[in-house]
């Protein structure tokens, strides 16, 4: 019985990587890309893996999680990282590329693979057989409609509205208290109480902070239930104290009184190493987020592992819908990859395509599918997007807060990150050796 041909939809970073991994595993691929016949509002060429925003793939050092992620991908023969290394331009400790050379290199590598057939047409139905959907944040309206029918309307989102996520270790626990509003249920939130003076200082900084300019195709993403905190603030001096900063039902146990305003932090991962700022979705520029949110009591030295964003982004509720193998729970032959799974960033998207591609090929060959251990950055991201709270799920980028904590407490952050990086790469090395035995 001959092996099936696998269909990959979308030739962005994730789709190109998935197609490459499948072909490298000896399985035929049919790669569909609607460009140049049908363009998106953000793309300008017909090349694969076109970088539509920055030309930087971020940090390249092993003291940074995304640097470790790149190294994991190198060891798994990633075409995206190989192309980036070949097309790199000087960028200090980051990996930045000549975006035109990079896209051309990926395109040539994938197009010229003997097991890859490229089809330049738009897919408007979810194909039969083994399929990897990697159509990205600007998925076409026709395919979006089919995805909505497949997943259920409540599990497909068209914008990304996320509050900043903070490392728990960087929160000053002497200035916060643990409680739920009106003491309902278990004490689930960290609460940062503010005096009127502290609130006024925060308010003034917030309304004067710089925001990211919206792209034309993002102009209509805001609505009442998802208002940026800075827009809410500009509606009136006390508006936030009746919204996400309302103090009612929260008594500071140290004073026995209600505060003027309270900022709540909600646990964001099962290991309780990450917390998000409740209701603080924002469009502020990143340096301003760091400056303004550091005015919140307890967050003076906060480490933001994922900045708040609001932009156009088609993604699914992966905790409800996907397995850590990137398979759709209700159809084992259907895989998703890229930003639409809820990973955030160029490298993270490619990494998800790498794993989805490996697993799609293994399924075609009748082999057991793989789940990378959570000690790896790739494995921790797959675990996060498939086990996060589905009610509050928002996309996430690579960070050390996703991996299991180091057994002993290490105060030196750089040393701790080096230990976590070494563990991740040892784990990947063991995995690759076992895979080839």
UniProtKB/Swiss-Prot annotation:
NAD found in the keyword field: yes
GO molecular function: flavin adenine dinucleotide binding; tRNA (uracil(54)-C5)-methyltransferase activity, 5,10-methylenetetrahydrofolate-dependent
Compartments in which it is found: Cytoplasm
Enzyme class: transferase
InterPro entries from the UniProt entry: FAD/NAD-bd_sf (IPR036188), MnmG-rel (IPR002218), MnmG-rel_CS (IPR020595), MnmG_N (IPR040131), TrmFO (IPR004417)
Annotated GO CC locations: cytosol
Reaction equation(s) it catalyzes: uridine(54) in tRNA + (6R)-5,10-methylene-5,6,7,8-tetrahydrofolate + NADH + H(+) = 5-methyluridine(54) in tRNA + (6S)-5,6,7,8-tetrahydrofolate + NAD(+); uridine(54) in tRNA + (6R)-5,10-methylene-5,6,7,8-tetrahydrofolate + NADPH + H(+) = 5-methyluridine(54) in tRNA + (6S)-5,6,7,8-tetrahydrofolate + NADP(+)
Name of protein: Methylenetetrahydrofolate--tRNA-(uracil-5-)-methyltransferase TrmFO
């Amino acid at each position: 019985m001959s092996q099936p041909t696998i269909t990959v939809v979308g030739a962005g970073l994730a789709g190109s990587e998935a197609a490459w991994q499948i072909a490298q595993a000896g399985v035929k691929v049919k790669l569909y890309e609607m460009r140049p016949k049908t363009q998106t509002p953000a793309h300008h060429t017909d090349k694969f893996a076109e970088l539509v925003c920055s030309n930087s793939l971020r940090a390249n050092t092993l003291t940074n999680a995304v640097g470790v992620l790149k190294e994991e991908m190198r060891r798994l023969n990633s075409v995206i990282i190989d192309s980036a290394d070949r097309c790199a331009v000087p960028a200090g400790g980051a990996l930045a590329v000549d975006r035109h050379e990079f896209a051309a290199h990926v395109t040539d590598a994938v197009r010229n693979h003997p097991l890859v057939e490229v089809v330049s047409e738009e897919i408007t139905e979810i194909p039969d057989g083994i399929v990897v959907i990697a159509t990205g944040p600007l998925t076409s309206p026709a395919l979006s409609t089919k995805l909505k029918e497949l997943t259920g309307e409540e599990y497909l989102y068209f914008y990304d509205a996320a509050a900043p996520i903070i490392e728990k270790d960087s929160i000053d626990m002497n200035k916060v208290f643990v409680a739920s509003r009106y003491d309902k249920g278990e004490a689930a939130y960290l609460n940062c109480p503010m005096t009127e003076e502290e609130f006024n200082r925060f308010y003034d900084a917030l309304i004067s902070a710089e925001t990211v300019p919206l792209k034309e195709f993002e102009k209509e993403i805001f609505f009442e239930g998802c208002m940026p905190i800075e827009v809410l603030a500009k509606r009136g001096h006390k508006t936030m104290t009746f919204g996400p900063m309302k103090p009612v039902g929260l008594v500071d146990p140290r004073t026995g009184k209600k505060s003027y305003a309270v900022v709540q932090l909600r646990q964001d991962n099962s290991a309780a190493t990450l917390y998000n700022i409740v209701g603080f979705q924002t469009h502020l520029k990143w340096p301003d987020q760091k400056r303004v949110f550091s005015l919140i009591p307890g967050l003076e030295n906060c480490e933001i592992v994922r900045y708040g964003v609001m932009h156009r982004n088609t993604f699914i509720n992966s905790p409800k819908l996907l397995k850590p193998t990137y398979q759709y729970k209700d159809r084992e032959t259907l895989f998703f990859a890229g930003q639409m799974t809820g990973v955030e960033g160029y490298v993270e998207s490619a990494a998800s395509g790498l794993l989805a591609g490996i697993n799609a090929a293994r399924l075609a060959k009748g082999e057991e599918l793989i789940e990378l251990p959570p000690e790896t950055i790739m494995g921790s991201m797959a675990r996060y997007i498939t086990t996060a709270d589905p009610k509050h799920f928002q996309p996430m980028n690579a960070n050390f807060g996703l991996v299991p904590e180091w057994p002993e407490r290490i105060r030196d952050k750089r040393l701790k990150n080096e230990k976590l990086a070494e563990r991740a790469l040892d784990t990947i090395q063991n995995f690759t050796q076992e895979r080839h035995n």
